[in-house]
Amino acid sequence: METYEHVGNLQVATKLITFIEQRALPGTGIKKDDFWSGVQQIITELMPENKMLLAKREEIQATIDAWHQKNKGPIDFSAYHSFLEEIGYLEPIPEHVTITTENVDDEIAAQAGPQLVVPVNNARYAINAANARWGSLYDALYGSNVISEEDGCEKTGTYNPKRGTKVIQFAKDFLDHTFPLTSGSHHEAINYAIMDKQLVVTLESGKMTRLKDETQFVGYQGSQGDPSVILLLHHGLHVEIQIDARHPIGKSDRAKVKDIVLESALTTIMDCEDSVAAVDAEDKVAVYQNWLGLMKGTLEATFTKEGKTKKRKLNEDRSYTAPNGETFSLPGRSLMFVRNVGHLMTTPVIRTQSGEEVPEGILDGIVTSLIAKHDLLQNGTFRNSKKGSVYIVKPKMHGSEEVAFANRLFNRIEDILGLERHTLKIGVMDEERRTSLNLKACIEKVKERVVFINTGFLDRTGDEIHTSMEAGPMIRKGDMKSSSWLSAYERSNVAAGLTCGFQGRAQIGKGMWAMPDLMNEMMEQKGTQLEAGANTAWVPSPTAATLHAIHYHRHHVPAIQKTLADDQTCYRKEILEIPLAGSTDWTNEDIQAELNNNAQGILGYVVRWVEQGIGCSKVPDIHNTALMEDRATLRISSQHMANWLRHGIVSKEQVIRTMERMAKVVDEQNAGDPAYRPMADNLEQSVAFQAALELVLKGTEQPSGYTEPILHRRRLEFKQKIAKELV
């Protein structure tokens, strides 16, 4: 049972009070009474507006539902457009918007590179992600399917030299392409040395050569005659050639190269939202404790692997000698953002005097900013932001009014924490239809603090389906990726960012590669996101970050953005094209395949969320391909099933039968997990199964199609069930 203490007119969970007063506040210069007084003021001022914005969402949705019910058949675009303008769904487009954000770190403003998103409540994942600033290309290639396992190149229990040869060949091809020599190849190199402030490479023939572009050599470790690391720079990203004649790999290399290490995940989003299951004070404090450990540089994780105990901690900065003899260092860790939750959910961690839960997004904003003040004051082992900023990603906002509300919240947080105005920077997730259609107006509301806009295909598709739920049955889920609205949405996001002056000042991001085991496919496809104008894109693992970094060497992002900067196209008409099925004459087999795929993904994710508190995991799909699943993937799958159910493509009985059958499949896929509770043994008593079923059967009733209300309630129900079993 949660215990609370009265703090002013608030009831605050004892666990949070203890954490704030004993861990988070000391060293910030803020007195506890002043802090809690400020929290009370913010909640009193902003909670009513938060509620009003959510009520407006529901009012708009009900109005749109009614319009579609009244206007059946093919949509009259002109009438539809006028209707959306009348109800304020489509806002006036501001003519000129230029962002003026100051004190933005180079990883955001100057460099282009991969971005990781990781659940902050998992210390090991969070540390691995922060440390993924640098990654071994040899390891990434050897352990992934980028290198084929054909012709004796299998990944075996011990090192496979034949596979290793292919890895080294790929890596040295990368060096030749990215850092070409005036003559010869890195494959022919037998020695790297520094002479007269230049990198000199000796080839097998005895000939000495240099880099075609000598400015690419920027530093080294060791001595000039016998360096242990050569540091190179291309397209703003660093690459290390690591040399060690005693290393097993270096020993067999002509030039004694043991590895090639790439600057990889420039930025990491430490997530409190979609990849996290945090439903009570214990969970929220665990989230905040890890964020504090990251900000102070003290976070550690101990785990057992192959029978051995291993420890992870944050990496130190990397020191080098410049060609002119001066020493310098580069960050050893990603620049960290923190993603707060959106405006929807409330939390039992703080209640009002009348017992009402307070908005979780307000609490996240206050506590994560308080914790980040330690970085601003340089209280930690390392510095996250060298420019004195705090980077907060704000998700799931609908239209400019909600973005303006987030801005006011940030203003008030800065006031109570004693921070200069616009210290708190905002990343705006463009993942809701009303934001996509009004993105320029949204940017205008935060033009002095925005550092990031990002498209999110999955959440955005979930909102696309829910908004137009009453319009008719949607196309199959797999066909969404080639739909016209989605292409326009992606192009519109880039155009808005560049028109508003993001180049050289802020990130324009693209979405996640969701198949962490299919790295060769990622290498073939993900470069298109940079060709489309993004200067960062999401990856699911440190390995993926290192491999995706190669795309930023292949594509010069600033030059691409320059060619796209004049795009003044208004994409509204295309974005408003609802992805309705022109014909619903799918075969029974096609319909069942769609149901099976959706049901299996829903159950595979929900069972871990509800019964293990895991908010992000690799979930095998119907074809046993491992997919990174979080609440965004759950939203699209549950809304798609709910849409087909609503329009009679499938029946309620068919949905239930499919879910029951797929529960057995998911049970089999999880058979090796000792913590797993099978669903199919007792479907009525399985909290996870009932949650998954509810997400579909009551999908049309969920606010904007979000899954959080059901997940949170069912997770708390399961926790209470376990507590009773232990008594």
Curated annotation (Swiss-Prot):
Gene behind this protein: glcB
Keyword Ribonucleoprotein: no
Subunit-level organization: Monomer.
Organism name: Halalkalibacterium halodurans (strain ATCC BAA-125 / DSM 18197 / FERM 7344 / JCM 9153 / C-125) (Bacillus halodurans)
Family indicated by similarity: Belongs to the malate synthase family. GlcB subfamily.
UniProt main location, coarse: cytoplasm
Protein known as: Malate synthase G
Subcellular location as annotated: Cytoplasm
Pathway the protein takes part in: Carbohydrate metabolism; glyoxylate cycle; (S)-malate from isocitrate: step 2/2
NCBIfam families: malate_syn_G (TIGR01345), PRK02999.1 (NF002825)
